[in-house]
Amino acid sequence: MVAVLGGRGVLRLRLLLSALKPGIHVPRAGPAAAFGTSVTSAKVAVNGVQLHYQQTGEGDHAVLLLPGMLGSGETDFGPQLKNLNKKLFTVVAWDPRGYGHSRPPDRDFPADFFERDAKDAVDLMKALKFKKVSLLGWSDGGITALIAAAKYPSYIHKMVIWGANAYVTDEDSMIYEGIRDVSKWSERTRKPLEALYGYDYFARTCEKWVDGIRQFKHLPDGNICRHLLPRVQCPALIVHGEKDPLVPRFHADFIHKHVKGSRLHLMPEGKHNLHLRFADEFNKLAEDFLQ
């Protein structure tokens, strides 16, 4: 690892492994199960799969939370489900196919998996009878949000993304390779995902994700969705943690430059999970932008 990444890369990898999914227990969800008194959980058939989602709030403004790699609504968005303004917003957090409780099917990563997730997300919200939605997308969920905003502009009201990238560099590819073997992750990081998925599925899916995200490096300019950025029409807020060990600042700058009229907000102490570590600050920022 040292020989491959070099000193800077190893430091970034260590920071990444310490900042991946924090330990949050996820209860096994059934049809219309309740999380406390205010968050409900259910599944709905969308594009041939049963997609799991959680919903809270009673506001007129629908907001969809899109999780990151191996993520789910509850593992990735606990403070948002609990504390976003329930009078102003109806908040939905989804588990993409193959993640969280949206299984079966097993997660796979064809060349168009981000586009598939974007279509699934939009079609889920339409199935739930929302006429228009705003998006909060973290990491892979931010990429999905960008694609959804570009491909379904009449349906997306506003968008907040963080920890996202529109292309893959050599540096990115090496960092992804460094997290392939989950047995090398810290126990604190690994155990919650083992509890959710079981070790075999967790380990296998992480390896498949690394291969899936690295495939973009073989495309011109490492393209994931950079060609779609000029098509985003909705107001967009890009949030970036200056200490993010996974997504360097230049990715946020690139998205900001190519999404017309977007705003860039920097959090000096923020890492990749800034919406969890600084949940109150992030929630206020998102609420102010969405209103």
Curated annotation (Swiss-Prot):
GO terms of molecular function: alpha-amino-acid esterase activity; serine hydrolase activity
Record keywords: Acetylation, Hydrolase, Magnesium, Metal-binding, Mitochondrion, Signal
Superkingdom of origin: Eukaryota
Sites bearing N6-acetyllysine, chain numbering: 86, 119, 126, 191, 217, 243, 260, 271
Any Pfam family the entry gives: Abhydrolase_1
Effect of residue 272 to A: Complete loss of valacyclovir hydrolase activity
Active-site annotation: 139 (nucleophile), 244 (charge relay system), 272 (charge relay system)
EC number: 3.1.-.-
UniProt xrefs under PANTHER family: VALACYCLOVIR HYDROLASE
The protein's assembly and partners: Monomer. May also form homodimers.
Name of the protein this chain belongs to: Serine hydrolase BPHL
Organism: Homo sapiens
